[in-house]
Amino acid sequence: MDKIVIKGGNKLTGEVKVEGAKNAVLPILTASLLASDKPSKLVNVPALSDVETINNVLTTLNADVTYKKDENAVVVDATKTLNEEAPYEYVSKMRASILVMGPLLARLGHAIVALPGGCAIGSRPIEQHIKGFEALGAEIHLENGNIYANAKDGLKGTSIHLDFPSVGATQNIIMAASLAKGKTLIENAAKEPEIVDLANYINEMGGRITGAGTDTITINGVESLHGVEHAIIPDRIEAGTLLIAGAITRGDIFVRGAIKEHMASLVYKLEEMGVELDYQEDGIRVRAEGELQPVDIKTLPHPGFPTDMQSQMMALLLTANGHKVVTETVFENRFMHVAEFKRMNANINVEGRSAKLEGKSQLQGAQVKATDLRAAAALILAGLVADGKTSVTELTHLDRGYVDLHGKLKQLGADIERIND
């Protein structure tokens, strides 16, 4: 069993580079199934276990996938006739596998996708995906743990109003509608930078999508799409995690690839706390010293504070004086890391969807386990400043979303090792 062991107390200094965005590359890999002419080459692809999982799903669908890890590139050739079924064996490992349904419906007019697995955070229902596909003309039914979708007369453009700005549903509907007949309007669409990256990719392939990054997206269906080369945007969640690593240790680091516009709600909160940020063309420099100010945070869909940064921000808030409240509105069950923080002597009380942090916690090293992907990073951040040794287990969560996080922190001066027991 792998574990990461951290001895707290070292100030981080130096420069670190952000990988390509996990939450952009997964939908873009599935969108490569839309290209019936020429392969696509994706660059700046992070070497993550989730990327390998989605590549396996694409392979079962009869796409040829070449993963060039040394180049951080993946080539997807989906020009052959695709299989209609994405089996449970792979889909069960990761929720993002549901994103093959839109491209399969668009290309084949039918699809069978196992109900997804993956992250432990809340129920993450897929009703919005199904609502979108049905609006486009597909008949959907659930049977034996599979979603069966059939659009025997083809997909037809329509207007779809999402009940909630779901990222996955927005992506799936964009992909399905890109080859539908006529115009599709998605209202109350998700606005994340990863949505914009997906739309840009499909447009480069010959698609006609406007409005990505706003709450109304228009997709004019086209006859066919072709493969292209596309660079994945930097990972704003990894960038935010690294900015907090600099701030929590009261260090001075340059995070190359961090883009302010992709993480405005986070950087404004950091500045409110007294963290010094220097925005440069190719990244952000973070510096902090002394006491930080207390702030409250409330997670919201983009451009609000990202739920994927909630646990890391909580780690930083533990090192600030005063009363702080963290409110989680996006996912249920996203305070599972609190029990692990408490093992490190954190002063936190959870009441419903809010966690109350009283005063500056004198964090102590402890044995803790990651409960989900972002909690894994948050526990490592807390370990950077805890007194003594912290040991973090259940690292399969971490490997789903971070490339060599311990190595990057070590390069910046952390006393950190990954050990295989």
Curated annotation (Swiss-Prot):
GO biological process: cell division; cell wall organization; peptidoglycan biosynthetic process; regulation of cell shape; UDP-N-acetylgalactosamine biosynthetic process
EC number(s) recorded for this UniProt protein: 2.5.1.7
Keywords recorded for this protein, A-Z: Cell cycle, Cell division, Cell shape, Cell wall biogenesis/degradation, Cytoplasm, Peptidoglycan synthesis, Pyruvate, Transferase
Post-translational modification 2-(S-cysteinyl)pyruvic acid O-phosphothioketal, affected residues: 119
Classification via Pfam families: EPSP_synthase
Associated pathway: Cell wall biogenesis; peptidoglycan biosynthesis
Binding residues annotated for phosphoenolpyruvate, in chain numbering: 22-23
Location(s), subcellular: Cytoplasm
UniProt key word Cell division: yes
List of catalytic residues: 119
Protein task: Cell wall formation. Adds enolpyruvyl to UDP-N-acetylglucosamine.
NCBIfam families linked to this entry: murA, PRK09369.1
Protein name (database record): UDP-N-acetylglucosamine 1-carboxyvinyltransferase 1
Source organism per UniProt: Staphylococcus aureus (strain N315)
Name of the encoding gene: murA1
